[in-house]
Amino acid sequence: MDLSVTAGPFKRSTITALAAALGLAGALLSGGAHAEGKISIAQQFGIGYLILDVVQQQKLIEKHGKEQGLDIKVDWNSISGATAMNEALLAGALDVVSAGVPPMLTIWDRTKGKQNVKAIASLGSMPNYLLSNKPDVKTLNDFTDKDRIAVPAAGVGFQSRTLQIETAKLFGNDNFKKFDNISVSLPHPDATSALIAGGSEISAHFSSPPFQYQELENPNVHKVLSSYDVLGGQATFNVLYTTQKFHDENPKTYKAFYDALAEAEKIIKADKPAAAKTYIEVEKSKLPLPLVEKIVSDPEIDFTVVPQRTFIYAEKLHELGVLKNKADRWKDFFFEEAHGGAGS
């Protein structure tokens, strides 16, 4: 089990899928059941987590906790892939996890009437691009059995579910898993290196910011599809979610966390160049600052805690039989603190 802690001012444990699955991380991190004033949070890799980077750097949870007379201890962790996130949350190893909308809906569906997992807030709307380094792959129709599409969590993650919705649209609901057999699980940084280098079995990558921008700087890489094409416009990429137990038993900690997220959104929108620097500092990114500034300022991207087009996933994934429970509206799978905005 590898539970390494990154060095430097921003410490974030890295939990492997095995540790998460076995719940061993619970012995090393703050456990799921505890009194007010503790929160353990996990995020994945990429600029989709910028709101959390700002929250961490500026200690906004601690700040909003103090406003309620509460000293909050925050544990920050990194996990790659939604499957490991969900296992860690249910094992009680983590209080709050983050992933794309579809993995959150999967665990909402699985735990309805039990742990009652729901979303806390959006981490922003941003497109995810399906990229290829093969000139002849221009549409989904051009993929063959020899191709391999890299995704963070094959079959179940945001990228795979988005691809399945588009596949159902093109090839019919019965064939929605058509591309699952050529999808392979690979963390974004590794998939990015493989696609840029070429010469490996990876001929496509359903990417996300900042990786897709990095890949598109290579002349051999081109865009095949955007998640915005699939969803009909600007849509939430990642969300934060937790159990009903944590939400109900830690009202002050939860409020401090939600208020911290809302403040981070305002901070990013007020000074995007500073937010770009925060990303590089907290994530220890080697990306050039001008590229990160370009991404943060991209009009396609909106760092907002308000959910956008999340209900499309709930509707489509229920239609495809992925979700057993039918949501009537987006508020069914978000805790009430998020209900105030003009969400969808």
Language-model regions, residue ranges each:
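Short, solvent-exposed loop/beta-turn-alpha elements that line the ligand-binding surface or hinge
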Residues: 62-70, 228-232, 299-307
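Short, glycine-/small- and polar/acidic-enriched structural segments
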Residues: 37-176, 183-185, 203, 209, ...
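Bacterial N-terminal signal peptides that target proteins for export
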Residues: 2-19
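Secondary-structure end/capping motifs
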Residues: 248-324
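Hydrophobic helical h-region of N-terminal Sec-dependent signal peptides
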Residues: 18-24, 28
